[in-house]
Amino acid sequence: MSGTGLSLFVTGLILNCLNSICQIYFTILYGDLEADYINSIELCKRVNRLSVPEAILQAFISALFLFNGYWFVFLLNVPVLAYNASKVYKKTHLLDATDIFRKLGRCKIECFLKLGFYLLIFFFYFYRMVTALLENDANLIS
């Protein structure tokens, strides 16, 4: 792995952190809706504003690894990429304020699953970043 691999995994790590923060924000919003701290219209406005950028960011991360030849890392990202693409294609990525209470449980489960995925992938990217850094240092020494 070269310096390109190091910068690629650092970029992936940072962008993955943004997606994780987005999922944490969604989790907090769903909890606020359950506790009646926020109304359904405001929740839908906030979630809908960030749902497409989150999918685009995930697609961008996947494309980065695909175009740089990291097939295994790309394949790790394919399930969430396919799920996001399916939601956008079927136009189910936007929440409706009149429907949110019926879908709240499913939305929370989806949010927790994505958050778990992003956390696992965070540690994978971190590990690969450290190994790339060590390989880069070993190449500089020799």
UniProtKB/Swiss-Prot annotation:
Annotated localization: Membrane
GO biological process: endoplasmic reticulum to Golgi vesicle-mediated transport
A Gene Ontology molecular function term of the record: signaling receptor binding
Principal subcellular localization: membrane
Membrane side Extracellular: residue ranges: 29-55, 136-142
Pfam families tied to this protein: Cornichon (PF03311)
Secreted as UniProt keyword: no
Segments passing through the bilayer: 8-28, 56-76, 115-135
Annotated family: Belongs to the cornichon family.
Protein name: ER-derived vesicles protein ERV15
